[in-house]
C-alpha cells in the first residue's frame, strides 16, 4: 500500500509476471484443487471432518492463483514481445485462462461438497459416506489425466480423457441412483450434482486439450 485515506487505497503491484510462466501457475492451481477434491472424498470414506477444515482458505488461494493467471494473460496479450521472451505463445496464454477458470470452479464445488460432507458425517450417514468416498479415486485420476493432456497438447490423450469423463459421469449418476435416501437426502443430492459437475468440468479441460492439439497439428 503506497497511499491510503478514508475513501481510497492505492496499491503497487510488485509481482514480476516474467518469473513464472502461466503453465506453472496452472500446475499449482491444479495441485491445490486436486487436494481439495481428494480430501472431500477421503473425509467421507474415513468419516473425518478434520480433513475438511480450512477448505475455504484453500479456495481463497485457488482464487488468488486464478486472478494471477488472468492478470498475467492481460499483460502478455498486450505485449507480444514479452510473451515471446518467456517462450509462451498467445494461444497458450488464452488457454491458460480457460483452464484456470475451470479449475477455480472445481474448487468452488469442493468447498460446497465439504460443507455437505460434514453434514452427512455428523448425521452418522456411514453407508452413504462410504459410497460417496469410493468415487474419489476415479474423479481425481480423471482430473490428473485431463490436465496432463492439456499440458502436453496430447490429442490421443485428450480423446481418451473425453471418453473417460463420459464414463465417469455415467458411473456417478448410476452410483447415486442406487443410494438409499434417508433424512440426509438433501446433502446427498448436492453431492450428486457436484460430483457430476466435477466430471463435466474435467471433460471441458479435455476438450480444450483436444482443440489445442488440433490447432497445432
Identify the residue ranges that each predicted region occupies.
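Cytosolic, long alpha-helical scaffolding segments
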Residues: 1-217
Amino acid at each position: 500500500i503506497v497511499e491510503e485515506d478514508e475513501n481510497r487505497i492505492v496499491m503497487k503491484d510488485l509481482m514480476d509476471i516474467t518469473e513464472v510462466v502461466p503453465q506453472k501457475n496452472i500446475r499449482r492451481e491444479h495441485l491445490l484443487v486436486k487436494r481439495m477434491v481428494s480430501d472431500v472424498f477421503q473425509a467421507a470414506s474415513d468419516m473425518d471432518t478434520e480433513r475438511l477444515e480450512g477448505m475455504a482458505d484453500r479456495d481463497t488461494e485457488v482464487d488468488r492463483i486464478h486472478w494471477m493467471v488472468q492478470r498475467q494473460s492481460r499483460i502478455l496479450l498486450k505485449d507480444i514481445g514479452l510473451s515471446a521472451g518467456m517462450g509462451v505463445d498467445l494461444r497458450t496464454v488464452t488457454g491458460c485462462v480457460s483452464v484456470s477458470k475451470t479449475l477455480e470452479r472445481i474448487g468452488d464445488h469442493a468447498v460446497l461438497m465439504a460443507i455437505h460432507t460434514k453434514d452427512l458425517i455428523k448425521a452418522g450417514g456411514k453407508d452413504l459416506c462410504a459410497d460417496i468416498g469410493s468415487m474419489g479415486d476415479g474423479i481425481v485420476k480423471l482430473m490428473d489425466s485431463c490436465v496432463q493432456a492439456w499440458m502436453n497438447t496430447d490429442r490421443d490423450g485428450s480423446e481418451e480423457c473425453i471418453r473417460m469423463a463420459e464414463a465417469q459421469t455415467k458411473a456417478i449418476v448410476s452410483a447415486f441412483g442406487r443410494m438409499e435416501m434417508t433424512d440426509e437426502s438433501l446433502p446427498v443430492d448436492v453431492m450428486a450434482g457436484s460430483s457430476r459437475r466435477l466430471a463435466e468440468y474435467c471433460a471441458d479441460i479435455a476438450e480444450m486439450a483436444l482443440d489445442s492439439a488440433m490447432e497445432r497439428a
